[in-house]
């Protein structure tokens, strides 16, 4: 999930929320890493924090609930352990981080560096936003590709040439421009690169086969 300095931050926050909090973050194509340009990272984190404060955890059958629990207490404990491990590596727990049984509150980790496990191959299946500052589009691509996974991604920029240039260089099967990674239209095939899978699935691909 790449956010360039000219991105519309309100839109980026809105889509980040959907991409990360859908099913409490337990989605294979949910955004795990948020690569944000240094010129707007503070503003993005501030807006994201305000948005997360409005999240209401509870019973999914309650219409006022906006996020449910994880699949089990064991899963929530694993997320808790991963957050603590990332903080031990030098990240800052900027918001959240608390577990209550199988519930884990939306969490923001800042000061995440490309060398940390969570910035590379540690997949957190929970509502955790790992914020990785980048200085340029080139650095964003480099950090994004330094992972053994490549299922889905997103690029936010008001410059379509910049966004498409970044998207074309990503080792990711699906890239959405100015939209979240939860977007999966049925007419397009779905699949991954590297450890995210081989081949494609979906209605259009099935008909082709």
Model-predicted segments: where are they?
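ALDH superfamily catalytic-core signature
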Residues: 1-114, 138, 142-143, 177
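Conserved C-terminal structural/oligomerization subdomain of aldehyde/semialdehyde dehydrogenase
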Residues: 2, 7, 56, 89, ...
């Amino acid at each position: 999930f790449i956010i360039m300095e000219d991105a519309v931050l309100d839109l980026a926050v809105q889509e980040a929320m959907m991409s990360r909090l859908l099913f409490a973050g337990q989605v294979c194509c949910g955004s795990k890493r948020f690569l944000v340009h240094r010129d707007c990272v503070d503003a993005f984190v501030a807006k994201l924090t305000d948005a997360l404060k409005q999240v209401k955890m509870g019973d999914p059958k309650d219409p006022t609930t906006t996020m449910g629990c994880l699949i089990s207490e064991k899963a929530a404990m694993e997320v808790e352990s991963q957050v603590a491990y990332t903080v031990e590596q030098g990240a800052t727990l900027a918001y959240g981080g608390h577990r209550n049984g199988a519930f884990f509150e939306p969490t923001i980790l800042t000061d995440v560096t490309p060398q940390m496990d969570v910035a590379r191959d540690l997949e957190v299946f929970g509502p955790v936003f790992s914020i990785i500052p980048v200085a340029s589009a080139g650095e964003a691509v480099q950090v994004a590709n330094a992972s053994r996974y490549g299922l889905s991604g997103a690029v936010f920029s008001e410059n379509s040439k910049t966004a498409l240039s970044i998207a074309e260089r990503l080792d990711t099967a699906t890239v959405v421009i100015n939209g979240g990674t939860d977007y999966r239209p049925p007419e397009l095939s779905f699949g991954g690169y590297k450890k995210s899978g081989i081949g494609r699935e979906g209605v259009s691909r099935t008909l082709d086969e």
